[in-house]
Amino acid sequence: MAESVTKGFFPSQVVSDNEKISPEYGLKVARAIESEWFKRDSGTNRFYNNQNEFHKLRLYARGEQSIQKYKDELSINGDLSYLNLDWKPVPIIPKFVDIVVNGIAERTFDVKAYSQDPYGTSKRTAYMESILRDIETRELTEFAQSAFGINLQENNPEMLPENSEELDLHMQLNYKQEIEIAEEQAIAIILNGNKFEETRKRLHYDLTTIGIACVKDHFTTSEGIKIEYVDPANIVYSYTESPYFDDIYYVGEVKTIPINELKKQFPNLSEEELSKIAKQPNQKSHMHYRTAASNDTNDKNTIDLLYFNYKTFMNEVYKVKDTSTGGTKVILRDDQFDPPIQEMTGQFEKIERSLEVLYEGVLVLGTDKLLKWEIAKNMMRPKSDHTKVKMNYNIVAPRMYKGKIESLVKRVTGFADMIQLTHLKLQQVMARMVPDGVYLDADGLAEVDLGNGTN
């Protein structure tokens, strides 16, 4: 069955840029996300349901699933007093999860960079042409070298391929431009600095266990490019049917942080505001946003924050004016710049374009306190289309259909339950197969007459 979604009431995107950047607009977006994922008055709570479902699947993957269902199956009117069984789950699923995860991890890769810009392509082409000339004039250059001592070859003769097939291999295996080597080293340093190999293993485990994986990339002035693992149980996103989540317009994650970390991230908060946030009723109860499993690990000195990205568009408007010296002057205007056509004739013209932008926001869950709402300072854009923007969160769920996420562990939980019940039934059968005991009367043996006048 497809996932049911409670639609939130998002503000209109067809408004001015000045209105979009206002805190009031950001609070409307945050409230809509909160309503879509966290409210229970409609009979459903997507965030709570996702956390419970993923928690259950992870317990199955560890062989630590709840045994209450097995006790209910074997008990008679709830009575277990006559059963003497080992209720420990049989670790069937963990073995196959490890096999699948390790098999995926063995598919290693190396980063290879190839320059495709006009300069890099022309440089590669010129290098190939020089080698081809050396191959075609090999006999002539050898004669000139032996007869006149003149080296006419453009490249090292020891590294010269024998034919065009070897030239293709040489270009693939040995030829590297300086910019390509620098790019490969830069990517390797970023991945190693973020311990991406360890993160990749966690992603493989999540894909196998719960069917969805997520990482977040962002830029900080102190640490540069950061790639962080994100628990899929804590993310929120707009409805999508794409397994690569490439058509979502908002995404975010819930983080539980202590008060001191909140002050560190938002130093402009006063002591009075911090105290007010910590004393919010919803923040105290936590029942609106946290599962029963997570309540035990949190205290009243922690705060639930919703970090989110919101994708919308903005209008870039320019006024192009001809100067008295014959030049052209381009002046940036806001999207409300709309002079009459009569004024633009012969004096200036208006140029505009629409492009996607990301807004970043932080909401204290259960309150109307919006800690952050601004245009993202570092936005990723595809090189082929600078009007598009990419989210900071990269999510994938390969077996998703109509919003419903499927995983390997989810498909085998039924078989694991049957194996566990069979294991318990076997224990019952083995207990009934124990033969009847033999009772020996020691006093009776002492009174037996041995026939020699003694007992």
Regions found by a protein language model. Give the residues of each.
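Extended, charged amphipathic alpha-helical segments
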Residues: 322-455
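Extended, helix-rich architectural segments
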Residues: 1-355, 359, 368-371
